[in-house]
Amino acid sequence: DEAAERAAALVELLSPFEADEGKAPAGRTPGLPGMGSLLLPPWTVTRYGTDGVEMRGSFSRFHVGGNSAVHGGVLPLLFDHMFGMISHAAGRPISRTAFLHVDYRRITPIDVPLIVRGRVTNTEGRKAFVCAELFDSDETLLAEGNGLMVRLLPGQP
């Protein structure tokens, strides 16, 4: 198949430029949608501070689970990404998600502007309890999530 051959040739052409983890732009470029990661939803950070984080964006046909609604598994990815940013914005060291819970309140549509806002709600030693809400442009609550981020121990992968 010609498309597959071209894709393979492109991968080979770019292979000398592969960057190590921590040096690649993916997930490290806040000015790009999805922070430069192909995995993350292509949203843009609009507020980033110790009191919380806000992102704006939309989902497309690539995120559909059926009937023009966002696939339910996409929202935990959005919230997990948000929880990591919330923890970092609050000045906490690198942490890992220990728990993530999502409540789906309404169908999340594609191709409409959406807003997600989140914050740290409590801290206990290595633990940061976080929450976030997903809204449409009318501020209708579509989903909400809460989670637990745990600071990594020295040398922990």
Predicted segments — roles?
Residues 57-59, 104, 151:
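Hydrophobic residues in beta-strands and at strand termini
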Residues 47-52, 70-92:
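Active-site helix/loop of acyl-thioester processing domains in fatty-acid/polyketide metabolism
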Residues 2-69:
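Long amphipathic N-terminal alpha/beta scaffold segment
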Residues 1-26, 108-110, 121-157:
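HotDog/MaoC-like acyl-thioester-processing domains
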Residues 48-50, 95, 111, 125:
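Short coil/turn motifs at beta-sheet boundaries
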Residues 38-41, 98, 128:
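Short, basic and Ser/Thr-rich N-terminal targeting/leader segments
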Residues 82-114, 120, 142, 149:
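Hydrophobic beta-strand-centered segment that forms part of the acyl-chain substrate-binding groove
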